[in-house]
Amino acid sequence: MQTLPAASAVLLKAQPGAAPQILITERSPHMRFAGGAYVFPGGRVDAADLATARNPVLAQGFAGLDDADAAARVAAIRETFEETGLLLTRGPAAGPAPLANSRNLLAKGPDSAEACTFAALIAGLGHRVDAQVLHPFAQWQPAENAEVTRRYLTHFYLIDVTDQPLAPLSPDGQEAVSLQWITAAALLENHLDALVFPTRCLLARIAQYPDIAALLAAAARHGSVMVQPLITNRGGEPWVTIPEGLDYPQVEAPLASLRCT
């Protein structure tokens, strides 16, 4: 089975005297992959995302980034806009009507044209994708022997939106059916069964830190290391393990206790 590139944005909003909140989306139960799961905004990387990243009219701060990272950063910004209505590009303020029209155009077109449409839309707004807004956090792909319907290698990026003007957000109604701002600890406590294994591990990693500054510093120290779990047999029971030393507080669990798709 082919491994496809994907990208996700972990949007963070500071709270005075409390842990930061994360924007989480609930996927439509009708989706083939992770239907009904709580996930970060994101989706598949398209070839046109790389073209956007390498176009100085449409992007800034991408010099020195490899192609996979560059394309994934654009895809993370694009998918966040599609699924939530939050446009995290640099440029003149855009009113609600132009943004709504842009989002509708993305929704109406075929999936294969979304990245090209997004490039045209930000060009029309006079906007650019700023690579430095995204902080590399992790890369994940399924275990070699995992029983999954699709295989993705997903880049995860942290984005601090505390100082962003956040207009009312709304799910696209196709991939995402609900949105909420919630802490990592609350997600793990209240929605554990709705979290696929990578999301669960990433939230546990985030929950270790009291604020966004500490989280970003830890992410910079550890880098965006690729994690591929191992599924092994222990006494007739399959267990999932990930490497130690990568800032994840839990590195193993029985497969039967996890949601994998």
What are these regions (language model features)?
Residues 1-261:
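N-terminal leader/linker segments that precede catalytic domains of diphosphate-processing enzymes
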